[in-house]
Design a protein with these regions (language model features):
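Conserved glycine-rich Rossmann-like NAD(P)H-binding loop of the short-chain dehydrogenase/reductase
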Residues: 33-47
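C-terminal helical subdomain
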Residues: 190-191, 209-253
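Residue(s) in the substrate-gating loop at a strand-loop-helix junction
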Residues: 150
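Conserved glycine-rich cofactor-binding loop
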Residues: 17-19
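The beta1-alpha1 cofactor-binding region of Rossmann-like NAD(H)/NADP(H)-dependent oxidoreductases
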Residues: 42-43, 63-75, 106
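Substrate-binding pocket helix/loop in short-chain dehydrogenase/reductase
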Residues: 100-101, 105-113
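Active-site helix of classical SDR
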Residues: 124, 166
């Protein structure tokens, strides 16, 4: 019998080709989970999956454009069909696009809503029945759903109106869902990192990337710091639930 905390568990990680997503997949695989890697591009997924397998882990690639509701739901179904269960969902996909209402193209607003809100909702809705079943049948006696936001989503500024719309509600959604699933032993948590380099910065538009550029000499978070936070949440004993975690570099305000 394995002594790894997540032995026998199955995790689905979205945007698994990104630095944070790949780091999270590696962290969960090291804990013993089989990991379904979901992202739009299959090339990067192949590399992440190969790296996990070469280290003795179990990973499958599930290429999907999760902004398409049907494909988002199918990604969850494919994970369950191929790996037999679903114990952990990490909603890691997201994008930051900042511009004023006067100048922002509507297509950018649509992209923000499609990825930051609609995709998360469809993935969650499809996964919840499987998570409930996993909590009832797993030796861990618990399942986990982790949403990944950004501390900047709580800060209003010029040009951030629609991004704030897509992220400021994530905390309320996560907390309400946590209360709904308490009785089912499905833990629901929110991880909100500050600026991560390269990580989240790679998901910023060009203008946004320039605006948040790190001041000289100041450290920022690394992708593995966020992966460690997610790993910490899902490896707690079933008696313990971490509902929210904000992660900053020590020098960040």
């Amino acid at each position: 019998m394995s002594d790894k905390t997540l032995a026998g568990a199955v995790a689905l990680v979205t945007d698994a080709g990104s630095d944070i997503g790949a780091g999270t997949a590696h962290r969960l695989a090291r804990e013993g989970a089989a990991v379904a890697l979901v992202a739009r591009s299959g090339d990067r997924l192949d590399q992440v999956a190969d790296d996990i397998r070469n280290l003795g882990g179990h990973a499958i690639e599930v290429p999907a454009d999760i902004t398409d509701p049907e494909r988002a739901c199918q990604a969850v179904q494919d994970t369950h069909d191929r790996l037999g269960r679903l114990d952990i969902l990490v909603n890691n996909a997201g994008i930051v696009l900042l511009d004023t209402a006067l100048h922002a193209p509507l297509v950018e607003w649509d992209r923000l809503i499609a990825l930051n809100v609609t995709a998360l909702l469809h993935l969650t809705h499809a996964a919840v029945p499987y998570l409930i079943d996993a909590a009832a049948t797993s030796p861990r006696q618990v399942a986990d759903l982790v949403n990944v936001g950004l501390t900047a989503g709580q800060l209003t500024r010029q040009g951030s109106s629609v991004y704030n719309l897509t992220r400021s509600g994530l905390e309320g959604f996560t907390e309400s869902l946590r209360r709904e699933l308490l009785v089912e032993r499905v833990r629901v948590g929110l991880v909100e990192p500050a600026v991560v380099e390269p990580g989240l910065v790679n998901h910023f538009g060009t203008a946004t990337r320039t605006a948040v550029r790190r001041p000289v000499g100041r450290e920022t978070l690394r992708p593995e710091d966020v992966a460690d936070a997610i790993g910490y949440i899902v490896t707690r004993d079933r008696r313990v639930a971490v509902s929210e975690m904000r992660v900053r570099a020590a020098g960040q305000s």
